[in-house]
Every structure is written in C-alpha cells, then in structure tokens.
Regions:
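His/Asp/Glu-enriched short active-site or ligand-binding loop at hydrolase and phosphoryl-transfer sites
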Residues: 167-213, 249-261
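Acidic-and-aromatic substrate-binding clefts and catalytic sites of carbohydrate-active enzymes
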Residues: 44-49, 70-83, 106-111, 160-170, ...
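Bacterial N-terminal signal peptides that target proteins for export
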Residues: 2-15
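Histidine-centered catalytic micro-motifs
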Residues: 97-105, 165-168, 221-224
Length: 264
C-alpha cells in the first residue's frame, strides 16, 4: 500500500509538471519577445473581406489602423452607411484606431495656381469631375469622415488622414496639417500588393516578399476588399504574415505612432 501511495503521488506530480509545462509553451508561443514595431493599416476599398480581416486580427490579438472613405461596397451600399454601423462599432470596442481617407475618396491631380489643389472625387454627386479645392474645401472633405464616424460610433477618429492612392503634394499635406490632420502614407516594403494583378503577383509571392522585407517602424497598407483582384489577398495572406512577423520579433502598433499602444 505504501508503494501504491508513492506511485500515485509521483503520478500526480508528474502530471502537474507536464500540464504547467504545456501551458507555458502555449503561452510563450502566443507572446513572443518583440524588439521591433510594425503598423498595420487598411483602407476601406469595397469591404468584401472586411469581416475576414476583423476575424484574423481578433484571433491574432493584433490591432490595426483603418482609413475610412465612403466607398461603394460589394453589397451595393457604402462603407459609411448605417448598414456598416455595427461593423465599425465592433472595431472600436476591439481597440483599433481610425483615420480619414477623404469622404468621397478624392484623388489628388495637381496643385492649383494660387495655393489650391485639383482633386477628382471617385464617389459622391461630383464623382469623376476634376475640381479645385481650397484649404477650407479640403478640410471639409477630410473632416466629413470624422463627423460621420462620430455619428456611427460615438467616437472621433484619430487626427490623421491618408490621401487616396497615396498621391500628395507639399500643398496638400499643408492643407491637412492646417486642418489638424497629419498625413499617414506607408513604407515601400509596407505596400502589401493586394490591389495588384493576381496572375502577375500571386498571394504566395506577396506573402514571401512582405514577410522578408518589412522593417522596424514600417507602416503597411492593404484594403478591406479590392474590385479588380481575382485572388483575394487577406484570406490567404494576412494571418500567415502576422505570424511570420511575430516570429521575426515584431509587435504591432497603432497610428499615429505618438499614440501607439503595442499589441503582441
């Protein structure tokens, strides 16, 4: 009986050690040491993979910054319609950050003659027209996203914005600054290629390139859906990219960098 008791005690001690060891391994695999920071960002696009992106970010416990524009979505509505209210509310609850991508997704064309800029809205009542914007008009265009986001979620966006296509000039950047919004572009290595042709730029090559080339402090850029790409990027690439970057020692920050709270 004494031997049986000793065997039982040894069994329980061994089991406890194994359990604790397994738990520790599991925890450490989810919280790798990080000594670098990358900033994931997403522009609205057609929103076709918006739910998938949110699902992956939540599962990986990673935060991102979303740049919003009232773009037409795959459902036939628009990204800042009430029909997307719950989506944006959930992202707020999860702790993501948000910036303006201009309300009507206005593309910079060229500088104007007297300190203005020529812009071409992609959406809205003046879509496709090349228009002259002074500082007040450009400020209104950037700020409309902020105002609409407050209506949808009760929370303002960060004081940041991103010009569609990343097309800017010193005059345009100054206009945003005067309005109180800092422009946020992306790194060369941070261009994740989800808007490129699928045949020429397949997902496996995009994943390999980004996993290798992204560097400390880089801002990445992808979309919540692209009309032209046949092979959707996010479902095939995003999660593995996050895992690969974690393995390389990256944490994930929020924009603007001055207000970044790193996630694992």
């Amino acid at each position: 009986m004494q031997l049986d008791r000793r065997l039982r005690q040894l069994f329980f001690k061994t089991t406890a050690v194994l359990f604790i060891g397994c738990f520790s391994l599991g925890a450490s695999s989810q919280t790798p040491h990080c000594n670098k920071t990358v900033y994931l960002s997403f522009d609205t696009g057609n929103m076709s993979v918006a739910e998938k992106v949110a699902e992956i970010l939540k599962r990986q416990d990673v935060k991102a910054t979303f740049f919003l524009s009232n773009e037409k979505t795959f459902r036939g509505d628009f990204a800042l319609d009430d029909s997307w209210k719950s989506y944006w509310q959930e992202r707020v609850k999860e702790g993501h950050h948000f910036g303006s991508h201009t309300y009507d997704h206005v593309y910079f064309v060229k500088d104007g003659p007297k300190g203005e800029v020529f812009e071409k809205p992609q959406f809205g009542p003046k879509a496709g027209m090349t228009l002259l914007y002074n500082e007040a008009a450009m400020c209104k265009e950037i700020r409309r996203v902020d105002q609409r986001f407050i209506e949808l979620t009760g929370q303002p966006i960060e004081k940041i914005w991103r010009a569609p296509g990343g097309k800017t000039s010193p005059t345009l950047i100054r206009m945003g600054n005067m309005c109180g919004y800092e422009h946020m572009g992306w790194a060369g290595a941070g261009f994740l290629g989800d808007e490129l042709d699928s045949d020429k730029h397949p997902n496996d090559k995009l994943l390999a390139k980004a996993s290798k080339s992204i560097a400390d402090g880089d801002i990445t850029m992808a979309h919540l859906g692209i009309w032209s790409r046949k092979e959707p990027w996010a479902p095939a690439v995003l999660e593995q990219l996050i895992v690969n970057l974690k393995t390389r020692g990256f944490c994930f920050g929020l924009l603007p960098k001055s207000r970044s709270n790193q996630s694992k």
